[in-house]
């Protein structure tokens, strides 16, 4: 099977994306691993990325973001977080996950022992306010749909609290 052919239609506009851990391995079950993502988001936001909505679940995250070169910025985000997360797994001797990452990596990833993220992010261009609202609702209700919480604002690793006027873990851009 070939590499992902999903592309960013217009890399300067907001896109809905899904970033999934290889083989859907549940890595984001520890606050330390989620904090690596938040640190990386904050860095990218300081570099100019706008984050409109997000949710982090145990093995993937959904995101609506925009930057001047979103395709390149998401590639940087994935590369940096992969190195940090693999480093965390190694430092904490979480060998079962490391072995699984190694056994499921793509053949062309021969220059490194582990692949962390699945290829591609399935970017969808957000065209108009109705689509933006629909995607934000989808993102925020993901943990509810999975039965993890009864209300979207109860999921800690989501921008739902921010949209409800409460403090969230990441500053979100509400204007698009």
Positions of predicted regions on the chain:
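Short catalytic/metal-binding and nucleic-acid-binding patches
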Residues: 1-176
């Amino acid at each position: 099977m070939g590499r992902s052919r999903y592309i960013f239609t217009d890399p300067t506009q907001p896109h809905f994306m899904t970033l999934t851990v290889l083989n859907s391995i549940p890595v984001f079950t520890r606050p330390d691993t989620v904090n690596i993502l938040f640190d990386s988001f904050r860095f990218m936001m300081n570099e100019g990325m706008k984050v409109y909505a997000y949710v982090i679940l145990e093995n993937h995250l959904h995101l609506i973001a925009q930057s001047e070169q979103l395709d390149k910025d998401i590639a940087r985000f994935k590369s940096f977080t992969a190195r940090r997360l693999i480093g965390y797994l190694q430092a904490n001797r979480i060998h079962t996950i490391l072995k699984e990452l190694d056994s499921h990596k793509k053949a062309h990833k021969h220059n490194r022992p582990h692949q962390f993220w699945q290829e591609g992010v399935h970017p969808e261009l957000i065209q108009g306010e109705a689509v933006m609202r629909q995607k934000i609702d989808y993102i925020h209700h993901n943990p509810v749909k999975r039965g993890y919480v009864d209300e979207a604002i109860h999921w800690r690793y989501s921008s739902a609290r921010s949209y409800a006027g409460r403090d969230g873990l990441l500053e979100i851009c509400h204007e698009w």
